[in-house]
Amino acid sequence: MADQQLDYASAKFVTSAPDISKLPPDSGIEVAFAGRSNAGKSSALNTLTRQKALARTSKTPGRTQLINVFELTTGQRLIDLPGYGFAKVPLAVKEKWQRSLSEYLQQRDSLKGIVVLMDIRHPFRETDQELIYWAVDCDLPVLALLTKADKLKQGARKSTVLKAKQAAIAFNGDVQVEAFSSLKRIGVEQVEEKLNQWYSKEYDDE
């Protein structure tokens, strides 16, 4: 069956959950967005959904430790995972978040793909690599977005993306790399295309 063409502008906030046990019932399809606290995750979600304030952009990276749930249509959700890797977050909070993330990736049947956002100037930091390896171990496809792509000139951007694609081979999984810019709307079409594939999986699996 052809991939669904979803209207991402229809996304609506549903709930904020402190951990996986407080999420909506594990049915339908979820796609999760994850990234370091300053990777531009909230801006990417707002750009994708064409809503300026769907996901709150915090001036204090690492402040939000809740899982935010947005619904596109019945049973189709976007999951905004808490930012990770920020130095000012207490160690106990980091450890709790790591446990929660691990549980979510391993146990959530409705999770069909994860978007990992990384600053194009600092891709594949240790925490990013850990997350991608976890996802691959759970047989989850990954879309790695190199955010803030407008910060690099076109030649440098292409070179960085090419190097990142080569580096992604080492994960030995379904890891696609794309440049992304919320400001210039670079890569939005590629994100929509990949998400449409993932949201069509329920039909392919039946």
UniProtKB/Swiss-Prot annotation:
One Gene Ontology cellular component annotation held by this UniProt entry: cytosol
One of the GO biological process terms: division septum assembly
Positions that bind Mg(2+): S42, T64
Cofactor requirement: Mg(2+)
SUPFAM superfamilies, alphabetized: P-loop containing nucleoside triphosphate hydrolases
CDD domains assigned to the protein according to its UniProt record, in alphabetical order: YihA_EngB
Domain of life of the organism encoding this protein: Bacteria
A GO term, aspect molecular function: metal ion binding
Chain sites annotated for binding GTP: 35-42, 62-66, 80-83, 147-150, 180-182
InterPro entries: G_ENGB_dom, GTP-bd, GTP-bd_ribosome_bio_YsxC, P-loop_NTPase
Domain annotation EngB-type G: ranges: 27-201
Pfam families, per the entry: MMR_HSR1
PROSITE patterns named in the record: G_ENGB (PS51706)
Keywords on record: Cell cycle, Cell division, GTP-binding, Magnesium, Metal-binding, Nucleotide-binding, Septation
NCBIfam families: GTPase_YsxC (TIGR03598)
Function: Necessary for normal cell division and for the maintenance of normal septation.
Family from the record: Belongs to the TRAFAC class TrmE-Era-EngA-EngB-Septin-like GTPase superfamily. EngB GTPase family.
Name used for this protein in its record: Probable GTP-binding protein EngB
Gene name as annotated: engB
